[in-house]
Structures are given as structure tokens and as C-alpha cells.
Amino acid sequence: MQDMKVNTASFMQLYAWYSWPNVILCFFGGFLIDRVFGVRLGTIIFGLFVFIGQIIVAVGAFTDAYWLMELGRFVFGIGGESLAVAQNTYAVNWFKGKELNLVFGLQLSMARLGSTVNMNVMGILYNKVAQTYGSGHSCLGISLMIASVTCLFSLACALILGFLDKRAEKILHKEQGKTGEVVRLTDVKDFPASLWMVFMVCVGYYVAVFPFIGLGKVFFEEKFGFSAPSAGAVNSIVYVISAPASPVLGFMVDRVGKNILWVLVAVLATLGAHVMLAFTFWNPWIPMSLMGVAYSLLACALWPMVSFIVPEHQLGTAYGFMQSIQNLGLAVIAIAAGSILDSSGYLFLELFFCICLCFALIATVLLYLIDLIRDGGLNLSSRERDKKRELDAAEARRAELRRRESQRDLTRLGPRSAFALRNRYLCRLGAQLPAHYSLQLSSLACRSLLK
């Protein structure tokens, strides 16, 4: 902010510009991969968007053009979320069953590891560059340009992965992976109230975590007197903890069940962490560590609930809408958080985050009540959920059997061909027909002769 001479509200616009394109693109990322580009080309294209966006941000900083940095973040956002969809498509195509749970956990862990490295290394890199070129926007631009090497590495991985996937397709005779997501905006009107509560929990929770981490480093420097490296370390502890904790907590939630209960625990824990940061001078490692565990727990418990609520053919729309609302909330709250910090300070900003978490808490309680009234099964134990799934599957098989029997009955009553009608007419007149014409017609013929 000092190098570019902008206030906090303008700085938070960089976060908002990443989220704005994803309010729309979350719906169409899967469609573009399935129908337009394919997973291999789509991964490369979206990786290229990320790389180009980072280059534009670096050039904007180097030339002291803040509007160019905002444009770069917009381009970066176009590729970022859709690249995650492509990554998930590869995972689903190559791993099945229990392997897939581990793969998704490792994906989240690697993402959080990257965030941790960014928070702790970029400050050191900036200081090293400043020793040679001096501080200022030029130093910032050079640092960001060096950081773009990681985006170039990501693009190289996309190219290598595309080559390996193409080779495997020829050897194993596999089809190119698809997301399986069919986005129909008309499905939104059929979403039950419980799903809307999940959306509200998602928005209320994440807007109190990501914008806070974006502003947290300066908060720890000003309130607790931390040095820049120490402030960066405590600010990144949320991601440090979530990297190893996500697979472990995901396994626990999968084994225990009770998803709503875990979501409630996560929201309350995060609310407690923000209250401690706002009203006490306790060591911030304590509330930030608590927030890290709660953040991982909520992700493991909240997102799978969507698949328990809506049928499989609506999952693409549901997850797309959930991500869209999340990005809309992050874009709006990021701007609001910057304005509150500039005008009122960190205490009121923390109170604002507490209000957002209270909103998520109310939505969680309403979700529990709705699920309890409608017997939705979101808070069942793992064993109860498996039993319910077996009963639902058996009922579905019986319904399918009844449907097929009804269809066969309708087929018998359906209109016949001209040849069949002619034979039926002849049978009514008593004419003898060859037996191989139709057993039913032969019986009619015989019955007519007995009259």
C-alpha cells in the first residue's frame, strides 16, 4: 500500500477484482471444459490466463499504474477458479472411491501450502530486491515479476499433464475427462430451503476469514507490535494448520458424520477467535491456531452436504451457485472491510467480522431445524447415513421396477401396426392364421372358432 500510495479500500479492490469474474464463471467453468476446450486444452488456457494476469499485475506495479494491477487481478481471476475446476476434473478422471477423498485432501493441502509460502517468502524476497533497487513501486514490480515464475511453473505442469493424459488415453483407451456438471439455471427454483441455508453459512463464514487474512499482517504489527516477518508468520498459521489438518479432519467427518454439528462447532470456534483478537491482548497464536482448525473443519463438513441435499443431476448447478454467491460475498465484503478499516480502525472491523459470523451461526441453527423437521439426514451419524442410503437405494429400485411394469402395461395397450390390426380383424371373423404370427392372435383365433 505504501509503495503504490493507496489506502486500504483501494488495496482490497485487488481481492474484489479476483472475485468479480468468478461470480459468473463459476457457472460456466465446467461447461467450457466439457463442451468447448476439453480438460487438457482448458487446463492450459486457464493456466495461461493466470500467468498473464500475474505478469500484468507486476507490470502495473513496476510502472506505478494501479489500474493496470486491477486489470491483472481481473485476468488472474478469470483463470484461477476455472483452473481449479480443471484440476478437479483430472482428479475425478484418474482416481476413484476412497482414493479420491485422499486426492482432494492433498489438493487442498497443497493449495494452503502455497498460500503459506507466499505469505512468508514474499516479504523476504521484497527486502532482498530492495537492497539492490531500493524500496518503492519498482521494487514491488520486480518482486511480483519474480513471483510469476510459480505461475509459469503451473503452466508447464499443465502442458506436461496434458501430454501424459493424451498418452494414457491412447494406451488405456480412456475417454478425455469431463466435469460431469450440467448447469441449468432453471434448477435454482427447485433448491430446497436447507440448501439456501448452506449457501448463507458459506458466505457468512468465508467473508470473515479471507478478507481478515488479507488485512491481518498489518493488524498484528499495529496491535501486538510484531515485526513484519513475525506478523506474516502468525497471519499464515491458518493455512499452515489447514494443510495437514484437512485430510485428517475430512477422514474424521466421513467416519463420524454429524455434519451440521461440526459446522456449528467450526462457526463458534471462529467467532471465539475473532472475539479474542478484538477484545483481548492474548498471544494471537492461540486464536489464529483455533481459526485454522475451525477453517479446515468447516470445509470438510459444509461442502459435502450439498451432495446430500440435491440430486446428482443438479450438483453442477448447486456447487456453481454456491461458489458464485461466495465470490460475490467476498468481492463486496473485501471492499466494505477496507472502507471500515480506513474510517473506523481494526476494532470495528473485527466487530464487523463477528456480525458476519453471527449471521453464519443463525443460518446453521436454521439449517439444523429445517433438516430436523423434514428428516433430511444432514446431521445423521455415518452409520445412520449408510443405512438411510441403503433404504433409499432399495426404494429407488422398487420405484424403477414399478415404472418398468407400468411401461410394459402401456406398451400392450398401445396402438398396433396396420398388419397387426388386419390380423386381429381376421381373427374376429374366424379366419385361421399361422401360429407363428402371434401367440396372442392365435389364441384369439381359437377362441373365435369355439363360439
Language-model-detected regions and their locations in the chain:
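Glycine-rich segments within core transmembrane alpha-helices of 12-TM secondary carriers
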Residues: 101-127, 325-333
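Symmetry-related core transmembrane helices of the 12-TM Major Facilitator Superfamily/SLC fold
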Residues: 141-160, 350-367
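Conserved MFS/SLC helix-loop-helix module at the cytosolic interface between two early adjacent transmembrane helices
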Residues: 24-66
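Cytoplasmic helix-loop-helix junction between adjacent transmembrane helices
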Residues: 72-110
